[in-house]
């Protein structure tokens, strides 16, 4: 944690004040925490869990080598690092589908609001949307309330798995991404790989080890961990309570 990160976090934290537009969100917390002391806080004696793959993600060997080496930095600072099984049992392809199902209704309502305001994005600019996005819009149009509640049950499973680790450890560390960076597409629709280590992944999101934390709400930060053999950046995700 750097001082600029700590200052930014302090300014963004806390409840929104009455009279602000938009109005205060009901789940915000009025907590004036000073994060600057954490910059110099020791981690000596901390227990840190290390999951190379959140149990279910295929990870590029170059990514694994960098993260395996860099977790030793925690030990050099006096922490105790243990490799763990998180307990996630759902296949990663099922989890990436879950993320898309959960995020697409908000997209649909946003598109509907724009249309009500006189801007029909799907009607007037249909050809400008990626095919993957249009496919999920179509799926989202047919989701039911029962589907929604079934998906919430899966979210609970993921939360319980992550929290069970953090009940015994101070932090959980993983790779940020399962793959190395990809080239930007010429058509503006850059996606990730469709396969890692011979296993199919969703090119939209299936190579990210970050989105399961969208299910759980645990605080998480990604930091630079090193470079691949080709000099490409590799990130490390640090998950807290």
Specify the residue positions occupied by each region the protein language model found:
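A short helix-breaking turn/cap at a secondary-structure junction
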Residues: 1-71, 77, 117-118
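Short, surface-exposed loop/helix-turn segments at secondary-structure junctions
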Residues: 27-31, 99-101, 150, 182-207
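Short helix-loop capping/hinge segments that flank enzyme active sites or metal/cofactor-binding pockets
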Residues: 37-51, 102-163, 179, 184-186, ...
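Acyltransferase
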Residues: 61-87, 111-122, 148-169
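Small-aliphatic-rich amphipathic alpha-helix that forms the alpha element of a beta-alpha
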Residues: 163, 200-223
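Short, well-ordered beta-strand elements
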Residues: 232-241
